């Protein structure tokens, strides 16, 4: 917020930003939206991405999220943010801020400090961070994309729709629900499922004393997750869920997204 850079202005369409390490695989999501952009050229990329995010969440069983429109697109890749301002899943962590965000952080083993540094800058608070992380209930991690997965395929992904394999955070990784949070609670109680992905920045949500109450609240009440738009700065969250929803969608879900946008 204090840098007046970044934000929802469609810069992900530029190769410069798609080339950032944290965005590996997002060319697939952008590619899915290109035919819609061509059909409706007057809609901005920024609005289209937000619409796709909302439609994808709804198609996955999540809430219907109201949207506001009128975002303007960046005119060139000169407006692409500096690489390194997104969070990592495991240490050692980079600074993720300032003029050299890819440089090692002095607290490069502190999971909670890392994600707070990233998301406080965006104006989010601890409750928002936990809610945002809940987007991991949808989607998978692949070796040739984020590289965050521990396994190339699991019981839940080896025969899934779309690209086979990868590792998901939940068993039903095309459903928008609170399983991500119940998985973290299970893990904290010793109920481990090695087929499910758990990053260091996931697990800290159930161990950090300030994150933990929100994680437990979402784990206890599915409806809290389905009312996420009332509990969080939802427009800040939508564009970050798009990767999971669009890149991991089945054909039925993709068609629903397109029908919502067309």
Where on the chain are the PLM-derived regions?
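Catalytic cores of secreted/periplasmic or lumenal enzymes
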Residues: 1-262
């Amino acid at each position: 917020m204090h840098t007046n850079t970044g934000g929802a202005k469609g810069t992900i369409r530029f190769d410069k930003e798609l080339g950032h390490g944290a965005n590996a695989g997002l060319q697939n999501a952008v590619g899915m939206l290109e035919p819609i952009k061509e059909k409706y050229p007057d809609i901005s990329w920024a609005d289209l991405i937000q619409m796709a995010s909302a439609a994808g969440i709804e198609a996955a069983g999540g809430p219907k999220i109201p949207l506001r429109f009128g975002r303007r697109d960046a005119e060139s890749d000169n407006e692409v943010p500096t690489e390194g301002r997104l969070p990592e899943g495991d240490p050692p962590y980079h600074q993720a801020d300032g003029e050299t965000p890819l440089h090692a952080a002095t607290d490069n083993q502190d999971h909670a400090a890392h994600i707070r540094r990233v998301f406080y800058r965006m104006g989010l608070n601890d409750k928002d961070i936990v809610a945002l992380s809940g987007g991991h209930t949808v989607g998978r991690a692949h070796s040739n994309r984020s590289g965050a997965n521990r396994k190339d395929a699991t019981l839940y992904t080896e025969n899934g729709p779309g690209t086979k394999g990868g590792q998901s955070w939940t068993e039903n990784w095309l459903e928008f629900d609170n399983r991500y949070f119940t998985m973290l609670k299970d893990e904290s109680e010793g109920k481990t499922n090695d087929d499910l992905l758990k990053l260091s920045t996931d697990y800290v949500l159930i161990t950090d004393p300030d994150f933990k109450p929100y994680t437990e609240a979402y784990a206890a009440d599915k409806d809290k997750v389905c009312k996420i738009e009332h509990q969080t700065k939802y427009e800040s969250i939508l564009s970050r869920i798009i990767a999971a929803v669009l890149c991991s969608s089945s054909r039925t879900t993709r068609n629903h997204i397109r029908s919502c946008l067309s």
